[in-house]
Every structure is written in C-alpha cells, then in structure tokens.
C-alpha cells in the first residue's frame, strides 16, 4: 500500500501524556503521527503529581533522567497512613531504590512534563500536533481508519459553518480521556466497579517553609479524610474528601479551600493557591481495547482512584506497550494480529493497580466513627504482626500475551543494574541500549544460536550480548544480573522493549525454542526469517 494513500500512519486523538508519549516513541522510529487535540490550547493544570520507578525507566526513552532533573524530585519518607490519633495503620514503601535501577517514587509538575513531551514531538519531522480539532466521527475500512473532524476553537459550541476535515490513518488511537470519543464511537463498554468518592484537590505553591509532618501521608480521620503529598519541586498537593451531604460547588470555593488549610497552618501569607477543584474518584476499565484499526489507551481504557499514585503510570505503560507493537506492524515486520495482544496483556496488569488503589481508598474513605475505630484496631494489629514491614506495591503481572508462561519470571517486570559496556559505566539502558534484549550469563548467545534464531533477533533489532564477569561483553558491576539469573536457574534471559521478561532459558536448545515461539507470537513475516 502506498503511503500516499494516508494522511498519517497513526492518528492519536488526545494530546495528554499518554498520547504525546506514544507519538514521540513512534516518531523516533520514523513513523508519521498526527495528534488531534480538541482544545485550542493545552490544559495547564496538574492532575497527576507522581510516578514510579517503571515510569522513570520509560522516560529514559526520551532522555529524561529522573534522578537529575530540575522538574522532578524525590523524598526519603515512607508513605504512611495514620488515624486521627496519629497512629500508623499502614506503611507503603516509597523510599527505596528498586531493581529497575530507579527510586520507588518520584514527584513532578505535570504541565512541565507535558510541555517537554510536546516540545520534543515538535522537533520531529514525522509528528504533527493539531489543536482546535474536534473528532465527530470515526469510520474504518479494511486498510484504514478515518477520523471525521471539525476545525474549531470552540468545541463546546461548534459553529454551523465550521470547517470539516477528514484524516485517514493506518491506525487510530483513542487517548482522549475518561469521556473518550474514540471508545464511545467503537462501542467499547466500560466495566464500572461502583466506586465513587468526591474529593477536593488543592494545588499550592508555598512561599514560606511549612511543616507537613512527613513528606507524603494520608490522614484517615473520619471527620475529614485528608491527603498530604508533594506536588513536584516547589509545590504541594492537599486533598480533602467531600463529606456526605456537602455542597460540592461551595467546597471548591477559594474561601472553603483556605478554611480547610488553616488548621495545618497553611494560609494565603504562606502559599499561593494554584487550583481548587472537586474530582470524582472512580474505578472503571474497558473489557476490549481494540476494534479493527482503532485502539484505546490511558484514561480512555481505565480509571482508578489516586491513592496508589498509578493512574498516569498506567497510561504511560499503555503508550510503550502500544509503541513497540505498532512499530513492528507499521514497519512490515509483524502481522496486524500482534495488536490483539496489547489489550489482553495490559488489561490484567491494570486490574491489579485498580484493585490496589480501591483497597487503599477503602481504608481512608470512611466517615463513620464506629467503622473507623474498628478499622484502626484491625490494621494496627496487622501492622504489628508484620513488624512494620512496608507494603510492596510492585507485584503486578502481565496478562496472557507475548511472554513464555513456562519460564520463571515470564511476564514480570525486568530488573536493571549498573553495568560497564564498551568503556561506559551506567545503568544497562544507558550503557547498552533499550529494546529487545537476549542476554547470556557469561555466555555469548550469538555463539550458541542457529542462523534462523539470529535472523529473527536481528529483524526485531535485539541486543544480543553476554553479561556477567570480566570475560563478558557486559560487565555486571553490581552482580544483579548474575544473582537474578542464578536465582531463576537460567543461563539466558529475553527481555522486551517495555522492560518485561519474555522468557528465561537453561540452555541454548531451550533458548532457540523460545525464540521460535517468540517469532510466532510476534507474527513475524517470513521475509524477516520467522
């Protein structure tokens, strides 16, 4: 099919972080991408304020170093949940370095991150951002998806004579939020878990030093459940739960905001109130994430309460999971059927974080004092029985898809350590590279694989190296890879571009079998050696 038949390879509806990151990742691979944003200007208020170690690793794809970035910071306190008396009910580990090579938790100012994503996109010859373009129709044929749109700066009041325009793409991605036009057009239903709580969100810029207690914590006081967390460098976020019968419009007023902050010694003389808005926390997810040549991502596919700090993270995981699949398909290396595995994998993974977020929400969203007292007694006993060990949130697993179910660690998040490669000592991603990787413990996989396996690996641009002691191409400086593979009883490991484990293998024969299976799962075309 001639590329001249298309206006773009991928049309992304929605210019938030999920859509823009996807555009940048595809643009880096030379694919033509058009972002459609219905508003004439971008939203300049934060929604998310935090991301985890996995997202820090993903941001490395676009050159953002979360450890050394003036727009990102981190804190050393655990994420504590306390009752009205100040007793600890729950500790979540937000303090340590992880096996991803990054800290458990980072804090940022979302408008700044989004601007940097857009600025990067605008430097790319293959990425176009269209503001003031409202999608009003979506149609598909065998080879394309077409967005029917209206060019207007007033999407809520479209003029009768507004210019109409169609954009024909090979694929359409709906990254257009909770009220997704793309999802609704495709008839993809959302499963609603019946979780609804209204909270007042306050974003502040302190002008004086203020004592917050610990850096990030939850006050589980039935009289007013409250969240106190960073909002990125130089900013703070406060969240107050709306009580039963409370007028939400009045709650969101500036006067109400300062009244709620006053007991915390936060006053207009000590901080600038940048935003006051009531949000309804919900838990919903789409059962199907694809219909023909259209797919959904981010809030269009899933919503969760913010208590685990994973909402935006889930959307950025979607971006990378889609990007490497679309790259293989658009490059002609893989059949279109590969895209079916995207939703299958991501749906189960995001379920974990939705459930975990709801569990945390069920701890704090209690306004009945008797119920709160019973909760306190139970959770204090549970914490004492655990000797105060913080809750580990990093156990989510991919759903069925592109990973070997018979391998130890298949479908799990891969580890990353400090290595030395060709004279450079750094994290593996920065020293060796990102993408598919086949690593052998003190063994060069290229020396033991047959020609068909090597052709398939070369087709997907895989890194193929030995890792381990000084005899290996990649020196395992910290010993992480050596310990990891020995613990798995493996000599080889295959990892994916989104940093998940495809498989582990004990010997060359098993590795070759796994690579053949990988070729089949990726639907690699015969011209690339599958």
UniProtKB/Swiss-Prot annotation:
The keyword Oxidoreductase is annotated on this UniProt entry: yes
Q: In which pathway does it act?
A: Aromatic compound metabolism
Q: Which GO molecular function annotation, any one, does this entry have?
A: pentachlorophenol monooxygenase activity
Keywords assigned by UniProt, alphabetized: NADP, Oxidoreductase
Q: Which reaction does it catalyse?
A: resorcinol + NADPH + O2 + H(+) = benzene-1,2,4-triol + NADP(+) + H2O
Cystine crosslinks: none
Top-level enzyme category: oxidoreductase
Domain of life where this protein originates: Bacteria
Q: What's a GO biological-process term for it?
A: 3-(3-hydroxy)phenylpropionate catabolic process
Reported consequences of knocking out the gene: Mutant loses the ability to grow on resorcinol, but its ability to grow on hydroxyquinol is the same as that of the wild-type strain.
Which Pfam families does the UniProt entry name for this protein?
A: FAD_binding_3
Check the record and name the InterPro entries matching this protein: FAD-bd, FAD/NAD-bd_sf, PheA/TfdB_FAD_monoxygenase
The cross-references to Gene3D superfamilies, in alphabetical order and at most eight, read: 3.30.70.2450, FAD/NAD(P)-binding domain
Q: Which EC number(s) are documented for this chain?
A: 1.14.13.219
Coiled coil location? none
Q: Which residues cross the membrane?
A: none
NCBIfam families, alphabetically? PRK06183.1-3
- What does the protein in this record do? Involved in resorcinol degradation. Catalyzes the NADPH-dependent conversion of resorcinol into hydroxyquinol through hydroxylation.
UniProt protein name: NADPH-dependent resorcinol 4-hydroxylase
Species: Corynebacterium glutamicum (strain ATCC 13032 / DSM 20300 / JCM 1318 / BCRC 11384 / CCUG 27702 / LMG 3730 / NBRC 12168 / NCIMB 10025 / NRRL B-2784 / 534)
